[in-house]
C-alpha cells in the first residue's frame, strides 16, 4: 500500500472525530471532503431571513476558515469560478456583475436542491440585495464604498475586492448565532450536494487508489505543503509536454486515474499532518504517523532521562493520537515520509518508509540502549548539525541538502539497524578534537554537545 492509500485510510479513521473541528494549539483543522482552508478577512452576521446585523474584521490569529469548494474554484487562477458559499468581495459586491451572477446561480442551485438549508437561503437572499459594500462601509469595516477603491485600499495587506467573507447566521426564532465555517450541518449538506454534482459532471471509472468504480478527477489539491503554498503532489494535467508521453500508454487516463473522494481524503489528510505535525529539516519536511490513529514515539527528537513530553508539538501529537506505545503491534504500520518542493508548483516525495509498529518501537529501544549509561540521548538533528555544520553568529548552521541527507541516513541507522557511516564518525571526531577551530571559544555549550555526540556514537 502506497502513500496516498495510507493517507486515505488515516482519513477514514480520523475524520469522524477531527474533520471540521478547530482545536486549541493546532495550526489548522482537518478539512472535510469538498472543503478547503483559506484566510478570511471579513466576518458578516445576518439573520436567517437574510437581513444584515453586523460585520467585523477577522483578527489574523483567528482567520483560518473552512469553506466549501468545487473542483474548479479550488483550482482557479484568474478565471471566474466562484466558491459556493464563503467568497471574496469581488464575487459578492455587484461591481463585477458577471462574477456576482455566477456566484448567485451556483448558490441558488445548492439552496434549491434537497441539500439546501437555512444558511444557504439566508446568504443568497442577502447577497441578492446588492448592499454588502454599503453595509461594510456603515459598519466601519471598509474605509470607502467607491468601486475604484476596491483595488487600491487594503485590509490586512489584501485588496478590498480580494477579502474573503465568512458568514454567521442568527436564527430569528431562537436567537442562536451559528458560525457556518464550524457547522457540522453545513459540512454534511455541502458534501452531499457536491457528491450529487460530481456524479453528474465527472467521468466514472476505476480509482487506482481504492479499486472502486467512482467519479474521477484530474484536478487535485494545492496548498498542502507549508514551505511552498502552491505546490501540488499530483499535478500533471499537461498532455503535450513531458508527462506520460514515451511510456507504454497513449492516454493519461491509461496511466493513472484517481477518484474525486480519494483525492480529497488523501490531500486533506496530508495537509493536516504536515501543517500540524510536520518537522522541518533543511528544505524538506518530515512527518510520521500510524494510519490507525495510534500514538507513535518520535524517531527524531532527543530525550532526557525521566522526561515524558519534550515539546509543544509532541504534547499536541499525544493529545490527538490517543494511545500508548505498548499498543503498537506487527499489524500497526508506522509511516515516515519527507516532502520537498521541487518548484513553486511541484511537490516531491523525497523519502518514504513503512515499518511494523512492534519492530519500530523495538528499534527505538535498541538505539536508546546503545547509549550506555547516558542520561541524555542526542537527536538525529543534533548529530547531523554538529558533524557537518559550522558556527555562524553564535549558531550552528548546516547546508540544507547535506542536512536532509544526513537526517535520512541516521533514520536508516536508527530504524533499520544500519551502521553509522565512517564519514559521519570522522566528522564528529574531527570537530570534537579541534574545538578552537570548530567553535567560538564562548560557545562552550556547542562544543560540549559535539563532544557528547562523538563519545556516544564513536566509542573507542
Locate predicted features.
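Flanking scaffold residues of small Cys/His-coordinated metal-binding clusters
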Residues: 201-202
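Short Cys/His-rich metal-coordination motifs, predominantly Zn2+-binding knuckles/fingers
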Residues: 210-212
Amino acid at each position: 500500500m502506497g502513500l496516498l492509500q495510507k493517507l486515505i485510510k488515516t482519513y477514514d479513521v480520523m475524520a469522524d472525530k477531527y474533520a471540521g473541528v478547530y482545536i486549541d494549539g493546532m495550526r489548522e483543522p482537518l478539512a472535510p471532503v469538498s472543503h478547503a482552508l483559506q484566510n478570511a478577512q471579513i466576518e458578516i452576521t445576518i439573520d436567517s431571513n437574510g437581513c444584515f446585523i453586523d460585520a467585523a474584521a477577522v483578527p489574523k490569529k483567528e482567520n483560518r476558515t473552512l469553506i466549501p469548494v468545487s473542483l474548479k474554484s479550488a483550482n482557479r487562477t484568474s478565471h471566474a469560478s466562484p466558491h459556493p458559499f464563503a467568497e471574496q468581495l469581488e464575487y459578492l459586491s455587484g461591481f463585477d456583475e458577471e462574477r456576482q451572477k455566477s456566484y448567485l446561480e451556483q448558490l441558488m442551485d445548492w439552496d434549491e436542491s434537497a441539500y439546501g438549508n437555512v444558511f444557504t437561503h439566508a446568504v443568497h437572499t442577502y447577497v441578492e440585495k446588492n448592499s454588502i459594500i454599503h453595509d461594510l462601509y456603515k459598519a466601519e469595516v471598509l474605509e470607502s464604498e467607491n468601486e475604484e477603491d476596491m483595488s487600491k485600499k487594503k485590509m490586512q495587506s489584501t485588496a478590498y475586492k480580494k477579502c474573503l467573507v465568512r458568514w454567521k447566521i442568527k436564527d430569528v426564532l431562537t436567537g442562536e448565532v451559528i458560525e457556518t465555517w464550524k457547522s457540522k450541518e453545513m459540512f454534511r449538506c455541502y458534501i452531499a450536494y457536491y457528491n450529487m454534482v460530481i456524479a453528474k459532471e465527472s467521468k466514472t471509472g476505476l480509482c487506482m487508489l481504492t479499486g472502486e468504480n467512482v467519479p474521477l478527477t484530474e484536478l487535485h489539491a494545492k496548498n498542502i505543503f507549508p514551505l511552498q503554498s502552491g505546490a501540488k503532489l499530483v499535478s500533471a494535467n499537461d498532455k503535450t509536454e513531458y508527462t506520460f508521453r514515451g511510456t507504454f500508454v497513449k492516454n493519461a487516463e491509461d496511466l493513472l486515474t484517481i477518484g474525486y473522494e480519494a483525492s480529497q481524503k488523501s490531500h486533506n489528510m496530508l495537509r493536516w499532518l504536515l501543517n500540524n505535525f510536520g518537522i522541518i529539516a533543511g528544505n524538506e519536511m518530515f512527518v510520521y504517523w500510524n494510519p490507525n490513529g495510534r500514538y507513535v514515539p518520535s524517531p527524531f527528537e532527543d530525550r532526557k532521562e525521566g522526561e515524558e513530553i519534550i515539546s509543544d508539538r509532541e504534547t499536541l501529537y499525544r493529545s490527538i493520537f490517543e494511545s500508548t506505545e505498548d499498543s503498537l503491534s506487527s499489524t500497526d504500520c508506522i509511516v515516515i515520509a519527507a516532502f520537498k518542493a521541487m518548484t513553486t508548483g511541484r511537490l516531491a516525495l523525497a523519502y518514504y518508509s513503512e515499518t511494523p509498529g512492534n519492530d519500530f518501537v523495538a528499534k527505538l529501544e535498541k538505539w536508546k540502549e546503545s547509549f550506555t549509561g547516558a542520561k541524555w540521548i542526542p537527536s538525529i538533528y543534533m548529530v547531523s548539525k554538529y558533524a557537518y555544520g559550522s558556527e555562524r553568529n553564535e549558531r550552528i548552521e548546516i547546508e540544507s541538502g547535506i542536512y536532509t541527507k544526513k537526517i535520512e541516513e541516521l533514520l536508516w541507522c536508527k530504524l533499520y539497524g544500519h551502521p553509522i557511516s565512517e564519514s559521519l564518525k570522522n566528522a564528529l571526531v574531527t570537530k570534537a578534537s579541534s574545538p578552537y577551530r570548530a567553535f567560538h571559544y564562548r560557545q562552550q555549550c556547542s562544543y560540549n554537545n559535539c563532544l557528547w555526540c562523538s563519545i556516544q556514537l564513536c566509542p573507542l
